């Protein structure tokens, strides 16, 4: 799919570093197909020199309050609030965070937003991206 003039495989080969926002309900160390695929995507983007803004729910095994985490090389992470996923209580379903994302992305505008999962967090990210006229892929 071509949204915003970039095909997904071109993101890795893009000559200028991009700021890519990745919105997902699950991410390593969770073990499932979505988490593992998203982890590899983020690792590949960072290894190629891109900056990743990872937005995901804080999971039960992670202590503390939701919010921004200390950035690591090439990766900024924001933990959103969540609720236990029905019948899969070890994972949190991200709650909507439209206003938080509007503020965050107004300060540090991503070049593109990748919606990995389309739960409440993903839908609120889509609404924020549309309001800011950011390109979105899913």
What are these regions (language model features)?
Residues 1-82, 105:
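N-terminal subdomain of nucleotide-sugar transferases
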Residues 33, 65, 90, 123-126, ...:
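A generic "cationic amphipathic patch" detector
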Residues 82, 137-138:
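Acceptor-binding helix/loop patch of EC 2.4 sugar-transfer enzymes
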Residues 87-112, 117-127, 131:
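An amphipathic, basic-hydrophobic alpha-helix
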Residues 133-135:
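Proline-centered loop/turn at the N-terminus of a beta-strand
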């Amino acid at each position: 799919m071509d949204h915003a003039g970039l095909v997904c495989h071109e993101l890795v080969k893009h000559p200028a570093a991009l700021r890519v926002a990745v919105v997902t309900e699950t991410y390593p160390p969770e073990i499932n197909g979505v988490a593992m695929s998203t982890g590899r995507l983020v690792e590949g983007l960072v290894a190629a020199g891109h900056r990743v803004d990872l937005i995901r729910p804080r999971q039960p095994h992670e202590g503390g309050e939701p919010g921004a985490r200390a950035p690591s090389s090439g990766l900024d992470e924001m933990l959103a609030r969540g609720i236990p996923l029905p019948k899969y209580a070890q994972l949190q379903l991200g709650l909507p965070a439209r206003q938080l994302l509007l503020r965050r992305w107004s300060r540090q505008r991503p070049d593109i937003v990748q919606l990995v999962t389309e739960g409440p967090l993903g839908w609120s990210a889509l609404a924020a991206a549309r309001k800011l006229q950011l390109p979105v892929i899913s």
